[in-house]
Amino acid sequence: MKRITSALFVISLIFTLSGCNGYNQIMREHLRDENNYHTVDATFVSYTESDDNLILYVKTEDKTAFDASEKNNEQIALKVIGKNCDILIDFFRNKDIDQGDSITLRCSTWIYMDGYFYYVAEAKAEDKQYLSFEDGLANIIAYMEDNKSLF
């Protein structure tokens, strides 16, 4: 009986540790490919700060890059992670990018398993580059490498 209990405990531990935490190989390969990022012209609505990331809420007329479920949503939520968050946060806090402003974003629009990976890799307005695509993508890749899944 003790062996069965121990075996069940070990199996439970393995499943717990191999859960959905971190970025697996499929996720890392997809999100590091620059061809999987789409340019979106949007109107900035608002943002929220959450732990180590930002959520940007935008409106866009052209939702072809997004999942069909987004077509009925008035706003789309995009996520800013890692160093990209550190780079962009002050522009939102200082209202350099404010409600109603036109902004061009380059972001992933990938849904994998049960998660939305709408990650912002570039942000610019007509006259200002807030985050370059090269830096933004490099920061996303670094963030994923620092947060790999066990399997």
Summary of predicted features, one role per range:
Residues 96-121:
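Flexible glycine-rich surface loops and low-complexity tracts that mediate binding to linear polymers
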Residues 68-95:
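Beta-strand/loop nucleic-acid-binding surfaces
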Residues 34-62:
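Structural detector for short beta-strands of small beta-barrel domains
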Residues 16-19:
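C-terminal motif of bacterial Sec signal peptides marking the signal peptidase cleavage site
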Residues 64-72, 112-114:
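Short, cysteine-centered beta-strand-loop-beta hairpins and adjacent loop/turn segments enriched
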